[in-house]
From Swiss-Prot:
The keyword Thylakoid does not apply. It is found in: Membrane. Belongs to the UPF0481 family. One of its GO terms (cellular component) is membrane. This is Putative UPF0481 protein At3g02645. Glycans are attached at residues 365, 403. Disulfide bonds: none annotated. It is a single-pass membrane protein. Pfam families: DUF247. InterPro entries: DUF247_pln. The chain crosses the membrane at residues 498-518.
Length: 529
């Protein structure tokens, strides 16, 4: 038996979608919103940039629960939809006067604002969207009640708790904060009580999930910031990222270039001498002078091993140079998006050997990242790592990339930490000095997590962070241990041809002296005999 044909053809379905789109546009244009409501409407819930989604899709795709319209129709999340409806029935039974139809009617005046918060077009009709908001906001509030500082009963158990936590912190899995406030206000019948409870659960959630240890000091300032937040992920972002304006760094760059030019004159002078030596040794007369005695010596008994070692040293540098050129070409061929700019900053281990000491700051804000050049102390906010941290970090970076037009402060901070953490030894040192608190299985897992964050939507510079990086580099390169090590690396290990030539000349002189002594002693014995 042939399957039944669909009621609407593809053309009719396409025409139906267009009709619904026109209706939504007319409804949006005809809606009467007050002036302050229009100012508050901002796009704040975005799709993850493809560059980031391709690098680690598991961190951006919900696995257990959908919040909002973007992922609610996915079959793998339907099981949790039934659970959300069960929680909704319990909420209805708990509050005698609570009816979801009344909540949907309360949210109806906010439909235009709700749609305006989403960057992607929402294909649901108004009633469907409002019911999604009512059910999801009620579930989310019940789930977050366990983080309240007050003793509030919750209807949700902790089964799959961490999975749900990761899902509700994803950028595509957000609902506007004003919807949560309206739902709580409807339940508690008090705007002030709703704000107090919502602020309480959000601060508790941020303390548990934040990658930086946050301390909330002033309640009044916190309430003022809370009023301006767009959703849960935005609230966490505002708590750990300072608000700064885009700075003009041209003058600072010129000063830094002047300082670098003055400080590197001696090194450039030595490089020029080395370059001239290479030009002399690369000439044909010098090549003949060098190779002729070397061929004689290499054919003597016992010198074959020395010849093989020298040939290896000569050819290895050429092979490394060829490999470096090939790698540079391959890097240029990498397609967009760009890799995160590798910071020119030593690792924690190298800095520790050079005398740098890492100190945790009292507040978890990124603005506390500083370096004291006099004492060699590197101040960093305390980093909190657990099984949820990677997802939170990646979604904060994605949210900043889509929502911020100025400097990407949090992205630059993650690049800084990625630059100083290269191995498990770096993680161990940070942990022992109180800068990092890890609940992962091992230090190696923590290092791999940071090093895995290698994609960025766009490169950026942040004034106070870049100044800190420059101060650290200046302090590190100014240490005598580092200077001597670099000189040995550049002018000893990097000059095998010159060293091999000097060794060959010295060996030739010793062999000649030995032959002369042998011939002269034989001549004396001959005359004496």
């Amino acid at each position: 038996m042939l399957p039944k044909k669909p009621i609407f053809s593809s053309t009719e379905q396409h025409r139906f979608d267009e009709t619904r789109w026109v209706i939504n546009v007319q409804k949006s244009l005809d809606a009467e919103l007050e002036e302050h409501d229009l100012e508050e409407v901002t796009v704040s819930i975005f799709n993850v940039p493809k560059a980031l989604m391709c690098s680690h899709p598991d961190s951006y795709t919900p696995h257990r629960v959908s919040i909002g319209p973007y992922h609610c129709l996915k079959p793998e999340l339907h099981e949790m939809e039934r659970y959300k409806l069960m929680i909704a029935r319990k909420i209805r039974n708990q509050y005698n006067s609570f009816r979801f139809h009344d909540l949907v009617e309360k949210l109806q005046s906010m439909e235009i604002k709700i749609r305006a918060c989403y960057h992607k077009y929402i294909g649901f009709n108004g009633e469907t969207l409002l019911w999604i908001m009512a059910v999801d906001s009620s579930f989310l509030i019940e789930f977050l009640k366990i983080y309240s500082f007050r003793k509030v009963e919750t209807l949700i158990n902790r089964v799959g708790h961490n999975e749900i936590l990761r899902d509700i912190m994803m950028i595509e899995n957000q609902i506007p904060l004003f919807v949560l406030r309206k739902t709580l206000e409807f339940q508690l019948e008090s705007t002030e009580s709703a704000d107090d409870l919502l602020l309480s659960v959000l601060t508790g959630l941020c303390k548990d999930l934040s990658p930086l240890v946050i301390k909330f000091d002033d309640d009044q300032i916190l309430k003022a910031q809370f009023q301006e937040c767009n959703h849960i992920l935005d609230f966490l972002y505002q708590m750990i990222v300072p608000r700064i304006e885009e700075e003009e760094l041209e003058e600072d760059d010129e000063e830094n270039r002047a300082d670098e030019n003055g400080g590197n004159r001696a090194i450039r002078f030595m490089d020029e001498i080395k370059h001239q030596f290479k030009r002399v040794f690369a000439s044909r007369p010098a090549d003949l002078i060098l190779r002729f005695p070397w061929r004689i010596i290499s054919n003597l008994p016992g010198f074959m091993a020395l010849k093989l070692s020298a040939d290896y040293l000569f050819t290895r540098q050429e092979n490394e140079a060829t490999t470096t050129r090939q790698e540079s070409v391959s890097i240029l061929d990498i397609e967009k998006p760009p890799l995160v700019e590798e910071l020119t900053i030593p690792s924690v281990s190298d800095l520790h050997k050079a005398g740098v000491r890492f100190k945790p700051t009292a507040h978890g804000n990124i603005s506390t990242v500083t370096f004291d050049s006099n004492s060699g102390q590197f101040y960093l906010p305390v980093i909190n790592l657990d099984i949820n941290t990677e997802t939170v970090l990646r979604n904060l970076v994605a949210y900043e990339a889509t929502n911020t037009s100025g400097p990407l402060v949090f992205t630059r901070y993650t690049e800084l930490i990625n630059g100083i953490i290269d191995s498990e030894e770096d993680v161990r040192l940070l942990r022992e000095q109180g800068v990092l608190v890890s609940r992962l299985k091992s230090d190696q897992e923590a290092a791999e997590m940071w090093n895995g964050m290698s994609k960025s939507v766009r490169l950026t510079k942040v004034g106070f962070l870049d100044k800190t990086i420059e101060d650290v580099n200046r302090y590190y390169t100014g240490r005598w241990k580092v200077k001597i090590g670099r000189l040995v690396e550049v002018y000893v290990y990097g000059s095998w041809q010159i060293l091999a030539f000097l060794a060959a000349v010295l060996l030739l002189m010793l062999v000649s002296l030995q032959l002369f002594s042998l011939v002269f002693s034989s001549f004396l014995r001959f005359r004496a005999g």
